[in-house]
Swiss-Prot record:
Lineage: Bacteria, Pseudomonadati, Pseudomonadota, Betaproteobacteria, Burkholderiales
Organism: Ralstonia nicotianae (strain ATCC BAA-1114 / GMI1000) (Ralstonia solanacearum)
Residues the entry annotates as binding Mg(2+): 54, 93, 123
Signal peptide interval: none
Comment on bound cofactor: Binds 1 Mg(2+) ion per subunit.
Cofactor(s) of this protein: Mg(2+)
Transcription regulation recorded as keyword: no
Name of protein: 3-methyl-2-oxobutanoate hydroxymethyltransferase
Keywords of this entry: Cytoplasm, Magnesium, Metal-binding, Pantothenate biosynthesis, Transferase
GO molecular function, one term: 3-methyl-2-oxobutanoate hydroxymethyltransferase activity
Role: Catalyzes the reversible reaction in which hydroxymethyl group from 5,10-methylenetetrahydrofolate is transferred onto alpha-ketoisovalerate to form ketopantoate.
Oligomeric form and interacting partners: Homodecamer; pentamer of dimers.
Family assignment from sequence similarity: Belongs to the PanB family.
Amino acid sequence: MSSYLQESTRKAVTVTSLQGMRAAGERIAMLTAYDASFAALMERSGVDVVLVGDSLGNVVQGQKTTLPVTLDHIVYHTECVARGTTKALLMSDLPFGTYGTPEQAFHSAVRVMQAGAQMVKLEGGEWLAPTLRFLVERSIPVCAHIGLTPQSVHAFGGFKVQGRGDEAAAQLKADALAVQDAGAQMVLMEAIPATLAGEVTRLLAVPTIGIGAGPECSGQVLVMHDMLGVFPGHRPKFVRNFMDGLTTIDAAVTAYVTAVKDGTFPGPEHSFTA
């Protein structure tokens, strides 16, 4: 049995303990979940952070993007996931159009926190710093999502790797420092070159979570449906199907946690170059 599965003696994961994991060099394993049953399974398997992502628009609702996801959708799924978790930290996305001003972000975050979230995730860099600071000053833990931000898919002209080239890399570093200075307790980086993600991770004092950002981040996240190989859409380069060769979902999630913790995932084949 994996050493990460000591559920009876496992302490609840908190924002503070995530910082401690980073300091100790223990990688953080995060997965998305959208209901109580899968959330409980992930907790049994040693997942540190469960994310109610707006990816539910793609994998649950069948949408082409995350843009149609509403705050009511996130609140509902957060309530469901909260019923299945007691030890993993529960993070929820604020969906598109719900944090245009600091005040709107606060009211959106309050609803999600009241539904059971312990941290909220917002997409944006330097421009988002005043909003992040506004939330943190009001005791709402925040994770900033930089790099490829799916809510900006149309502004990017599609799902494209970010941070390539000197100017883009410098901007991403500036984004990371700005959101940290604003009080973000975690930074998620998506679809950026692995070397750049490593540089940002060493630059920051808070944990970094990667998805398509190489192996040097403080932790990793995948969408549950992707890592189980059940999503019929395009499989991104950074995804590994952990169901391959296994017969149960529990075993696949445990394999994911183990691979993240021991540093065997992601490999070079899951990472982007500059």
